Amino acid sequence: MPPRAPRPAGAVSPPFPPLAGPPLKARAPRARDSPLTSPCRAHAAMASVVAPAASSSAAAPGADAFLDAACPEDVARALAAELEALRALGHDVGAPAPGASRREAALFITRAVDGLKAFSRVDERVYVACGKLVHLRVRSREADLDAWLASPELALIPAVAAAVRRHRARVEAALRWFWREAYPALYARGLQSALKYEEMYLARLEHGRCEAMDQFFVRLAAAAATATRRPMALVLCGSDAWPEVFDAYFRALATQAIVPATPLMLFAGRARGSLASCYLLNPLPRTTEEAVRAITDEVAPILLRRGGVGLSLQSFNRTPSGDCTRGIMAVLKALDSMTAAINSDSERPTGVCVYVEPWHADVRAVLNMRGMLAADESLRCDNIFSCLWTPDLFFQRYQRHLDGERAVKWTLFDDRASHLASLHGPDFAREYERLERLGLGVESLPIQDMAFLIVRSAVMTGSPFLMMKDACNRHFHTDTRGAALATSNLCTEIVQRATPGENGVCNLASVNLPACLAGGAFDFAALRRAARVAAVFVNAMMRIGNYPTGASVEGVRRSRSLGIGLQGLHTTVLALDMDMADPAARRLNAAIAEELLYGVMDASVELCERGLRPFDGFEHSRYARGVMPFDAYERVSLREPMRWDALRVRIAEHGVYNAQFVALMPTVSSSQVTESSEGFSPTFTNMFSKVTISGELLRPNLPLMETLRRLFPRECARRDAVARLERAQWSVAAAFGELPAGHPLAKFKTAFEYDQELLIDMCADRAPFVDHSQSMSLFLTEPADGKLHASRVMGLLMRAYNLGLKTGMYYCKIRKATNNGVFTGGDLVCTSCHL
C-alpha cells in the first residue's frame, strides 16, 4: 500500500492514493451499540451527517460548509475501487453520484453497508469489505491536523497539544509510517473493528468532523510521552527525548501490540474524563445513613467518571428492626436507581458489583434481587451485580455433604459477627464455628440449599459472581491476617486492599497475542517487549489520571497497581493450527502467562534501578523477602528459572515500582477493535449476531470461514458447507460429524463445546503468574430436556476451589437447548474493565 502523507495545515483532506489490495477494516454507519447505550455515538454522529438541519443553529452553518463540500478525491477513488471489488464478488450496490459531497458519500456508504452486512453470514470477504467502506466514511469526515489540535470539543490537554506542535515534523514522519506500515492491517480487520473505532473511540469534533485513525493513536502516544518521566523513558526506549518516547508508544499502539483500556482510549490526552478502569471500595458502613453517604460521596463520583466499582457492603449487616426495616435491600435499591440514572444518558455505561460474604444475614435477598427472582419491584435491582466473597469453609462443608455426611449446615450471621469479615483461612473457620456454638447465628440452612440458591441465581440472572476470599488473601503480596481483603472489582479480576480512606484503583491495558505471531510461531520476545511497553505506558498514564475522589488518589499513590492482561489467546492457538485442548496449547498457555508476568515485573524493577522509589510498603511485602507470585503454588515449571533468580536479586537490591502487575480481564470492547478472541476465553460462537436499531450485525469467525474457502475451492461446495453449519447452529462437530485428529476444521470449537473442566484447568495453569486474578466465566449448554442441574455448576465451582483459583465464576453463560447457535449480544456489561 503506498504511503499516505499527513495532512498539511489547513488542507481539507490529505492526499491518499487509491486503496487496493487485500480487504481492509471498516466501521459501520449506524448504531451498533447495545440498547443500553442508545442513542449511541455512531447514531448521533450519522444523524449530524445526514440531517444537519437538526443541529443547533449556531453549529449548523459550519457543519453544512464542511459536509456539503465535495468528498475528497482520494476517498472517492478508493471508494470506487472498493465498489469494483464488491462487484467482482457479485454485489453491485451502485455508486455515489459524480462529485458527491462528504454527506452524500457518507450516506451512500451507510446504505451500502446496511444492505451488504447480511451477506457476512456466507462470505467473510463481504464482512471485511464492509469494514473498508466504513473506514472510508471515517476518512470522508476526518479533520486535518491543525483543526484536530485546536478542537474545543476534543479539548486536548495544553501540554499534549504543545508537544505535538513542537515536534510536528517527527509526528508527521510517524504518520507517514502509519499509513504505509500499520494502517493496511487495521483497514483489513473487519466490520466490527471499524465500527467500534468510529462509534466509540474516535472523538467527534465540531461541524461534522471526526478524529482520524492516525490522530487517535497520536493522542494516546503523545499523552503518554508527555507524562513519561526520564527513568520511564529509559526503560521504554533507552532515550528520554520526547520524539523517541512518542515513537515507541505510537508504534506499539498503532500495530495493536498493546491495547489500552477503554477509559484510556476515550480520554487520554483530553482535559476530561478519568483514565482508571477499576475502583474497589470498602467504606465499612454500619448504618443506613453511613451507607447512603458512601454511595453518594464515594460511588457516584466514580460512576460519573465512567469507572467500574466493586463495593463491599459486608459491614452493613443488620437484621430488619424498627430503625432498619428492610436491611441491606433499601440501600441496594438506592444504589440501583442511582446507577440507572447515571447510565441513562451515558455513551459508555458502567456498573457496580456489590460484595458480601455468604454468611451475611441478607444474603438470600441479595441472591433474589435481579430478574424473575425479585419478589416485587421494590426489591428489584437489575442495574447492579453481586458477588459472593466466599471463604474456604463454605466449600469444605459442601464437600462434607458430597461425601455423604448428613445435615451439614450453613449459618448466617448479622453485625454481631462483623469481625468475621476481617479474618480468613483457619482463623475465620475457628471463629465462625465458635460463634455457631454460641448460638449467635440468625438462621441456619442445609449447605446444599445454600449452594442451590447461589447457582439458581447465577444461572437465571447472571449474578452473583463468586470469588474465593481465602485464595485472594493467601496470595496477596502483603500479610492480611486480621485485616482481610474484602472486595474485588466489577469484573472479578482485580485483587487490592480497600479501606475507608483508600480505594483500590487499577489501570489496565492488554497485550494482543496475535500481534506476537511471526513466521508461523509464537514470538515470546515480542510478547516480552509488548509487556514492557504496556507497563511503562500504564505507569505514565497513571501519573496524569484525573481521579474522582481523595480515597482513589491515595490508593494510586500507595500501590501504583498495574493490571496488564492479554487478549486473543484462542485466536492465537487457532493461528498456530492447534486446538485449545492440545497439550501443546496447554503448554503455550502457561508459557504466555509466565512471559507476561516477567516482562511487566522486569520493567517495574528497572524503573527502580533507574531511580524511582518502590511502592509504598514495599519493605513489608513478600517481594522484599524475595518471594515471587508463583512461589506459593505447587509444581510450577519455569521456562527460564535462572532469570527469575536474577530478578529476585534485583528486587531485593532496588525494589519494585508497582505493587501488582498482571490481571486477566475480559477485554470485551478492545478485542472488538483487534478482531481477536476475548481475553483468555475460547470464542463464544462461530457466528456472532447483534441486533440493534439499524438491523443485525453479524461477525463471522474469520479463521473458520477462510479455512472453509481453502477446503472447498468450488463455490457451490463452500456454500453447501456454510449451509450445513447454519443448520447445525454453527457447530462444526454437529455439521460435519466426528472429524479425525488434525483435520483443519476439528479445532473450531466454541467455549460452549469445550469441557469446562479443561478451561478451569487452563486458568489454574496460568494462576501462578497472575498476581491479581482472572475473569473466568463458565459456558454451559442446557440439556435437551431444558434442565440444568445445580450440581453440575457446583461441581465446576468445587474444581475451581480445589485448584486454588481466586475467581470461581464471573458470568455463568447458558446456551439454551433451543438456541440457534448464533450467540447474541446485548448483555449488560461494563466497558471499563472489559476494556
From Swiss-Prot:
The gene is RIR1. This is Ribonucleoside-diphosphate reductase large subunit. HAMAP family: HSV_RIR1 (MF_04026). It comes from the Viruses. The record marks C830, C833 as: Interacts with thioredoxin/glutaredoxin. The keyword Transport does not apply. PANTHER family: RIBONUCLEOSIDE-DIPHOSPHATE REDUCTASE LARGE CHAIN (PTHR11573), RIBONUCLEOSIDE-DIPHOSPHATE REDUCTASE LARGE SUBUNIT (PTHR11573:SF6). Ribonucleoside-diphosphate reductase holoenzyme provides the precursors necessary for viral DNA synthesis. Allows virus growth in non-dividing cells, as well as reactivation from latency in infected hosts. Catalyzes the biosynthesis of deoxyribonucleotides from the corresponding ribonucleotides. Coiled coil: none annotated. Residues 1-39 are annotated as: Disordered. It catalyses: a 2'-deoxyribonucleoside 5'-diphosphate + [thioredoxin]-disulfide + H2O = a ribonucleoside 5'-diphosphate + [thioredoxin]-dithiol. Disulfide bonds join C278-C506. GO terms for molecular function: ATP binding; ribonucleoside-diphosphate reductase activity, thioredoxin disulfide as acceptor. The keyword Disulfide bond applies. Its EC number is 1.17.4.1. Pfam families: Ribonuc_red_lgC, Ribonuc_red_lgN. Belongs to the ribonucleoside diphosphate reductase large chain family. GO terms for biological process: deoxyribonucleotide biosynthetic process; DNA replication; release from viral latency. Substrate binds at T262, S277, C278, G308, N489, L490, C491, T492, E493, P666, T667, V668, S669, S670. Heterotetramer composed of a homodimer of the large subunit (R1) and a homodimer of the small subunit (R2). Larger multisubunit protein complex are also active, composed of (R1)n(R2)n.
